[in-house]
Amino acid sequence: MKTLVIACVALVLVVVHGEVIEEVNEKQLQESVEEKYSLLQRLEKLDEAITAEENRNSRVRRCGSKRAWCKEKKDCCCGYNCVYAWYNQQSSCERKWKYLFTGEC
């Protein structure tokens, strides 16, 4: 009889202890998820800011008073062509002579 009571008490303690541990684990998991989610949001904001900065720096200037560096004709404004210079291996926007007389792009 004592053995049966001890076994029942042990079983109840194991079940109660398991539920307590499960609740603690759920709370820790929830806190961990919230912490990681907030960290992920901060990282995404930083990534967006860095990408925006890179995009701003990589844009080609158009229609400046000085020569603008270009990669293709579409990087230059109306009346300019993207001309490659062999001496510095770079292309820049230069005014078309035809535009001076006709005004067409």
Curated annotation (Swiss-Prot):
Tissue distribution: Expressed by the venom gland.
Q: Name one GO cellular component term.
A: extracellular region
Q: What does this protein do?
A: Selectively slows channel inactivation of mammalian Nav1.1/SCN1A, Nav1.3/SCN3A, and Nav1.6/SCN8A and shows higher affinity for insect Nav1/para channels (site 3). Induces tonic repetitive firing of nerve impulses in insect neurons accompanied by plateau potentials.
InterPro entries cross-referenced by the UniProt entry: Delta-hexatoxin
Tell whether Disulfide bond is among the UniProt keywords: yes
For this protein, the record's Pfam families field holds: Atracotoxin
Q: Which residues cross the membrane?
A: none
Which is one GO molecular function term here? Answer: toxin activity
Q: What PROSITE patterns does the annotation carry?
A: DELTA_ACTX
* Name of the protein described by the UniProt record: Delta-hexatoxin-Mg1a
Q: What is the lineage of its organism?
A: Eukaryota, Metazoa, Ecdysozoa, Arthropoda, Chelicerata
| Keywords noted in UniProt | Cleavage on pair of basic residues, Disulfide bond, Ion channel impairing toxin, Knottin, Neurotoxin, Secreted, Signal, Toxin, Voltage-gated sodium channel impairing toxin
Q: What is known of its domains?
A: The presence of a 'disulfide through disulfide knot' structurally defines this protein as a knottin.
The cellular location(s) given in this protein's UniProt record come to: Secreted
In terms of SUPFAM superfamilies, this protein maps to: omega toxin-like (SSF57059)
Leader peptide range in chain numbering: 1-18
The entry sums up its family as follows: Belongs to the neurotoxin 06 (delta-actx) family.
Q: Does the keyword Manganese apply?
A: no
Disulfide bridge positions per record: 63-77, 70-82, 76-93, 78-105
